[in-house]
Amino acid sequence: MTTKRKPYVRPMTSTWWKKLPFYRFYMLREGTAVPAVWFSIELIFGLFALKNGPDAWAGFVDFLQNPVIVIINLITLAAALLHTKTWFELAPKAANIIVKDEKMGPEPIIKSLWAVTVVATIVILFVALYW
């Protein structure tokens, strides 16, 4: 049996996300995927350049020294830091940690995640620069 009734479909404009600051920040956070894709492609090209010998690697390093690429990489770094910040703020909401019959607040978890990130960054930089 078919019906002639038309269901109500609420109109949705293409600018729905511009109405509230929460939605704008949501779109910004989701947009951090684009710089992540850029960095992934750049890293893959770097690996292929490393595999193809010193001349290819020198060309890749020259490419990285282009001022436009430096600016794009700084934007990518900012996007990665924003994504990391929002992810670390989300992590305590997913973990229900109880210490001495009280639920632990989000601050210790967020601070420990940042501490691990800083330590890992320092170790990686030390190995890359001085090993």
From Swiss-Prot:
Topology in the lipid bilayer: Multi-pass membrane protein
GO cellular component, one term: plasma membrane
Transmembrane segments: 30-50, 63-83, 109-129
InterPro entries: Fumarate_red_C (IPR003510), SQR/QFR_C/D (IPR034804)
Domain of life, source organism: Bacteria
Alphabetical UniProt keywords: Cell inner membrane, Cell membrane, Membrane, Transmembrane, Transmembrane helix
Pfam families from the UniProt entry: Fumarate_red_C (PF02300)
Compartment(s): Cell inner membrane
One of the record's GO molecular function terms: succinate dehydrogenase activity
Predominant place of localization: membrane
Function field: Two distinct, membrane-bound, FAD-containing enzymes are responsible for the catalysis of fumarate and succinate interconversion; fumarate reductase is used in anaerobic growth, and succinate dehydrogenase is used in aerobic growth. Anchors the catalytic components of the fumarate reductase complex to the cell inner membrane, binds quinones.
NCBIfam families on file: PRK04987.1 (NF003445)
Family, per entry: Belongs to the FrdC family.
Stored HAMAP family: Fumarate_red_C
Subunit structure: Part of an enzyme complex containing four subunits: a flavoprotein (FrdA), an iron-sulfur protein (FrdB), and two hydrophobic anchor proteins (FrdC and FrdD).
Identification of the protein by name: Fumarate reductase subunit C
Gene: frdC
